[in-house]
Design a protein with these regions (language model features):
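P-loop NTPase motor domains
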Residues: 1-202, 217-218, 228, 286-318, ...
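Conserved ATP-driven motor cores of ASCE-family P-loop NTPases powering translocation/secretion/packaging/pilus
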Residues: 194-196, 200-305
Length: 328
């Protein structure tokens, strides 16, 4: 939540860390709410919307009193203790900052989605089914919801396969088609999940508009670590030089034969020029990129490049679904 509601330079600053500690404390508090008999409240009464309502309707003094009254072994105590280490005159600003991050829970629909426990994240690994996660490409306010879905689904399915399935593999192949990947939201630690999902009978496809967009979303080596987990790369076309240079380098070098012709030219009506050099022709071998970046950029729309691990690149023709014989 904090990562997907932060700017490029905010994710690791003081305010974000302080808000994260308070958020963790409140989540642990709400998740473990019990009735007078000591039983956990229904799941519908222990949602993220309740966290937002606490910070929106209660003073920081009331919140602190509730958290301080918890037993020492309660999981909310440690993050709350870290929050209290901030100066007291900063507490109000931290609460306001966290409230702004959770403002999306003012929407009843968002509150309903996160409050009800009716999405079985393990179902795709048990029987064939399809989950569609549809979000706006223009409005980023709800992106952390889609990032929460995938951040929970990947490790939960992996743990289910490892601990409860025969041979450590899901009985049904589970595929993640992550179209418009950079608009899903930031997925923390996704490279580690992608590294191991094959062994659990899972697969994934990441679709991005350009590498520069991917690099902006996952700076440093993050995007490269994610890309390295895939064995096939399909290039459909691009308009940015970063992607073109990357594809050009991935295609590798080829050896070409160069033919040089030399023919002496005698100036007309020149009494002083004479040449005894004969006509000559030389052949040599040199290297060049299989496809230069400008050639990658100019690739015809009806063609695509496929890069396979351990094999030479393939230049193929695209086919629309309507061209398939069995398309209905």
């Amino acid at each position: 939540i904090v990562q997907n509601t932060s700017g490029p330079k905010e994710a690791n600053d003081f305010w974000s860390r302080a808000e994260l500690n308070l958020l963790m404390a409140l989540i642990h508090y709400v998740v473990n709410l019990r009735d007078a008999d000591g039983n956990l409240l229904p799941i519908e009464q222990r949602g993220l919307g309740d966290v937002y309502r606490m910070i929106a309707t209660e003073s920081i003094e009331e919140i602190n009193r509730k958290l301080e009254a918890l037993p020492p072994e309660h999981p909310a105590k440690y993050p709350h203790g870290l929050f209290l280490k901030a100066k007291e005159n900063l507490w109000g600003n931290i609460v306001i900052g966290l409230g702004n991050r959770l403002a999306v829970f003012q929407s009843r629909l968002v509150d309903k989605i996160t409050r009800n426990h009716d999405v079985d994240l393990l179902l795709p690994g048990k029987r064939p089914c399809v989950y569609f996660v549809i979000i706006s490409a223009q409005d980023s306010a709800y992106r952390f919801l889609s990032s929460l879905f995938f951040s929970l689904a990947l490790p939960q399915l992996s743990n289910f396969a490892r601990l409860q399935c025969a041979g450590g593999r899901l009985p049904v192949l589970t595929n993640f088609c992550l179209d418009e990947y950079c608009n899903i939201g930031y997925l923390d630690g996704v490279a580690d999940s992608l590294n191991s999902i094959r062994g659990f009978n899972m697969s994934a496809q990441i679709v991005v508009q350009s590498l520069s967009q991917w690099q902006e979303k996952y700076p440093g080596k993050e995007w490269e670590n994610q890309l390295a987990t895939f064995d096939q790369t399909l290039y459909m076309g691009c308009n940015d030089l970063t992607s073109a240079k990357y594809i050009s380098e991935k295609c590798g070098k080829v050896t070409i034969s160069v033919l040089n012709n030399q023919m002496p030219m005698m100036p007309l009506f020149s009494p002083v020029y004479s040449s005894t050099r004969p006509y000559s022709q030389t052949r040599s071998n040199t290297q060049r990129d299989l496809m230069n970046p400008d050639e990658v950029l100019r690739l015809e729309n009806r063609k695509c490049l496929v890069l396979f691990k351990g094999h030479k690149p393939a230049l193929l023709y695209k086919m629309t679904p309507e061209e398939l014989p069995d398309y209905a």
